[in-house]
Structure formats: structure tokens, C-alpha cells
Amino acid sequence: MAAGSITTLPALSGDGGGGGAFPPGHFKDPKRLYCKNGGFFLRIHPDGRVDGIREKSDPNIKLQLQAEERGVVSIKGVCANRYLAMKEDGRLLALKYVTEECFFFERLESNNYNTYRSRKYSNWYVALKRTGQYKLGSKTGPGQKAILFLPMSAKS
């Protein structure tokens, strides 16, 4: 190489020119989603119920976040083998199969917590009350502690 010359590296194939964005697919390691409101981990039960628990050894808090497209994820309970969904009445539950109600816009907020806003019901967020129960989507909004989640490693 001559002095002052510039070398360019080839772009990664299949990145769609996304400027460093992850291609669609799962994030390698399972996560636990820690809610700022009450210190609960989001839990998906095998029977489809959704709530929060403080016990970090509960196997039902291990979640797989799947990138569906840029900024959109689905959230699957690893042990429950079910997908988090928000219904038209704002309830959270877990389904055996992915539907349009299972896609959430994931956003990193300025306080370094993530929010998960329903793609289908666009003003509603995944949220946990201080009691550990889920909060109806229709009762959620920006600025609430209940919608703030910190993704943490769930490696055993």
C-alpha cells in the first residue's frame, strides 16, 4: 500500500445495507427482562399466563428475543415455548404461534431501559404493575416506570 492510500473493506453480505443493524434473527443469548417498576422479571407461563416475579432463578423468565425486522421483535418464553402477545383489549398473554399481536417495537430509551410497544396497537406498551401483574396496554404510556425493562443475560 502506498502512503496516503485508502483501503476499503467489502460489506458483509446479506446485511441489506443496514448500517450496522442486526439482520433479522434471534439474539444469541436468552434474556431476562427486568422491569423498573417493582423489580420484577417478565414471566411467561406454559399455560399462557404472563406476570412478573422477583425470583431470578424461575425458569419461566428466560426469554428469547427474535428480531423480525429493524426495530421489531417477538418475545418467546424459552421454557413455555410461547410468544408474548397483546390482545385488542390490552391483555398480555402468551400464544403457541406467532401472530400480528406478537410483534413489538423495541426502543432503547435515554435512561438505558428498553420499551416494548405493540406494533398492532401502536400506543400500548408491555408493562408490569408494582404488584407483579401485567398492566393493560390501554393504561400504559410514555414516561411510566411500568413500561421500562432492562434486558439482562439469562445464561445459567
From Swiss-Prot:
Residues marked Important for interaction with integrin (site): K129, R130, K135
PTM (free text): Phosphorylation at Tyr-83 regulates FGF2 unconventional secretion.
Name of the protein described by the UniProt record: Fibroblast growth factor 2
Signal sequence interval, chain numbering: none
One GO CC term, this protein: cytoplasm
SMART domains for the chain: FGF
Phosphotyrosine: residues bearing it: Y83
Prosegment residue ranges: 1-9
Keyword Secreted recorded: yes
Keyword Plastid in record: no
Cross-link Glycyl lysine isopeptide (Lys-Gly) (interchain with G-Cter in SUMO1) mapped to chain: K96
GO molecular function: chemoattractant activity; chemokine binding; cytokine activity; fibroblast growth factor receptor binding; growth factor activity; heparin binding; identical protein binding; integrin binding
Main location: secreted
